Amino acid sequence: MDYKITGYEPAQLFHFFEEVSAIPRGSGNEKGISDFLVAFAKERGLDVYQDEVYNVIIRKPASAGAENAPTVMLQGHIDMVCDKLGSVEHDFTTDGIDLVVKDGVLTANGTTLGADNGIAVALMLTVLDDDSIAHPALECVFTTDEETGLVGAETLDKSQISARTMINLDSEEEGVATVSCAGGVVVTYTCPIAREHKTGSTLTLDISGLLGGHSGSDINLERGNGNLIMARIIDRLMVAGEPAIVSFNGGTKDNAINRECKAVLVYADHAAAEAAAEIARGIIADVTAELEVFDPGFTCTVEIADDAEVEAMDQKSALALIRALRLAPNGVIRRNVATDGSVEVSSNIGVVATSDDEVKIMLSPRSSITSLQNEFKDRLQTLADVLGFDAKFEFEYPGWSYAEHSPVRDVFVESYRELFGSELRIESIHAGLECGLFAEALHGLDAIAVGPTLSDVHTPDESMELASAERFYELLIDVLKRLAA
């Protein structure tokens, strides 16, 4: 193929990235890239394992002289988030990524780039392909469906892995190593609703412009949540009068801070709707002032339409919905005040959806401490019981605890200092990583998560600094050489 990325070393790293990018590999569509990896291994005479969900493990013997060094696992995921600009024609099920190189930065042409986590795949392929590198025995683990709930890592038969040293390649900032993460679970509240025929004037409230963000790593930034703001407005309107809720919909992902929410209410006549609109505008002004620093793009439009005939929730159903949203925990719940104030427990109300006969609320609670996670789940169940909602807990994944003693962390710190003359920053993140699933299954696992600088992942603005990838490869090879000694 004709390669677009030139002038960076090793060239093979960037060639592999381009080859991987040419293969459609959205979550749930990973057979093609998985089969590509199997063929890659067989062409080089490497031992390869592929399971029924298309996870792949490629094993490479130690380089000469490193046969007695402990085996090392390199790990990343092969799926990517698929998102694009509305103006772009791109079919993620059949089309590869159209790469764009400009001023040392790699992006895609109006779509997600997939460097999260395609760069990990390219890094491992480069190491596996180069017989001049000094390294211990390697187990390169390529997992599926990470972006939709760490599914591949959870499903993988961990008995296939002998390594007890793990280098996860799914971190997104050069010069930073992640050494622990939070666990989490998806909680879905559902409640049946009754509807009744109403005539009058509708009041439509439409929230937009919020920054949103990741419900783990961005939960401490005090950004607005459209679902909560909408519930606040409607709660006040319920105190002032008797609106009936026709619909309330906000968010599409439990693990994203909600940016947009739209609700439709119905009043007996135009005068009642206009009076409610004035109250709503006052609350909107308050919220705008409250978010001026943290989320300045917030807007909420208010529109009235007369002569409406709708099927609205009855008062009992409407009260159940608003009470649930006003009482369900959201945001930072607990911090570690003994150390750096990092978030230990949080919750995010990511999705609210009303249908003809049901309301659904999806929450994403997280904790870096298992006992606190379990206690918080109990609280959420109690709240559901009190409010009359059914609660379902699913897609749970474990946290990854900080290790006081970590040889692989020490090696990375020493290597980074000697190569670049500065200190590697060590951090914990309040988000889920595949490391947690591997650490839970592989007793005594010594793990670290690292990677080059990526920006705006999961969006059409996603980018990768090519020089950062170049430097990171240098670091990875040096670490493997040290681990082989």
Regions found by a protein language model. Give the residues of each.
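Acidic/His- and Gly-rich active-site-bordering loop/insert found
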Residues: 3-105
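Active-site metal-coordination/substrate-binding segment of hydrolases
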Residues: 66-164, 190, 199-202, 315-318, ...
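Fold-level recognition of mixed alpha/beta catalytic cores in primary-metabolism enzymes, strongest
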Residues: 136-226, 234, 238
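Zn-dependent metallopeptidase/amidohydrolase metal-coordination segment
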Residues: 5, 10-13, 337, 344-360, ...
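Active-site-adjacent substrate-binding region
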Residues: 223-248, 402-445
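A short beta-alpha structural unit
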Residues: 18-22, 253, 299-312, 348-352, ...
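His/Asp/Glu-rich mid-to-C-terminal helical/loop segments that flank catalytic regions of hydrolases
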Residues: 159, 223-240, 270-273, 317-326, ...
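Acidic-enriched catalytic cores of C-N bond-cleaving enzymes acting on peptides and small amides
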Residues: 196-200, 219-249, 268-346, 380
